[in-house]
């Protein structure tokens, strides 16, 4: 069977799909991944075959436009203004950019690029003839090619956030700039367009899917390639002295601005506690941390799935990848969300009892210290996190899901005859 994956230009949003790709290939099926050019190398390193026929996306610009518009409307929670939507550089005045003007001036270019991407995806799919399409939430081409070919398409969630969740503004539900669905005689893309959803979440934090059919699967963490550090197996087992992992996304800093980077506040908060701290950040964020107190270590790039099982708590931005890896490790989470899907993910996990959530803008060192103390000292959060890990482990593994997907494809083929 041939299975087409389509992915957006955000690696952390398709990482959760990688183990399913492995399982399909191990079962003898063919997998191709239609992607933008920047994703070809990370997909190849993940062991999947990229087809880089899509245009480079401008999701970063659209996401920053959303933040800028929030500032114009008085909804921006941080003291400093958001970065310039196009350049990503700091600004000192909201007069530096006008979203409506920019979108008006660039709509034709956005539509042309979107048309080239959707046309290329449909053209490849028509030639290759997959029997299933699997895609992430930001991929417009996935549901489109499934509808055009008349084969099932499945939305693969990256965490406890789905098509009916939150304020689905720019950067979350893909925008059909070229009206590709209409050009192919289809109804416009809406949350109800998604008929099948692959959900790797524990039942306790699974998002509502509307009328879509849920296909549960056990989450197998994949955080990108890496090397196991030689010091990692020598760490004392969790519990001898509390160990806290601090993770932050460089992409989040780029979208919201360097002034929103909370790790220095987290360092100040944790310095007063008797804990060991492991900090993993990348890029320019490393330069923003400064000198660390004793007992804290700034790590080189380390796959999170190797690190979290050795920790008692993780502090992060509420992204799906961090959240799901922590759920798989069975450890409590403190989530400092900025926006987009982060607040929904953080609040959903906090409501389950497996962690605490607070807006990053309100997270001063005292609040962070109090939350970390509660999560480390209260066994209820730890017990709930372990229960959610058991829920996750009880889900069908990717190999079992492959069997179900084969049945879905066969049923669709029979119905089409």
Q: What do the predicted segments below correspond to?
A:
Residues 93-94, 98-183:
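Conserved nucleotide-sugar donor-interacting segment of glycosyltransferase catalytic cores
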Residues 36, 175-252, 282-285:
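A nucleotide-sugar donor-handling region in carbohydrate enzymes
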Residues 370-417:
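C-terminal amphipathic helix plus adjacent low-complexity
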Residues 1-57:
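N-terminal subdomain of nucleotide-sugar transferases
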Residues 21, 299-348:
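A donor-sugar binding/catalytic signature common to diverse glycosyltransferases
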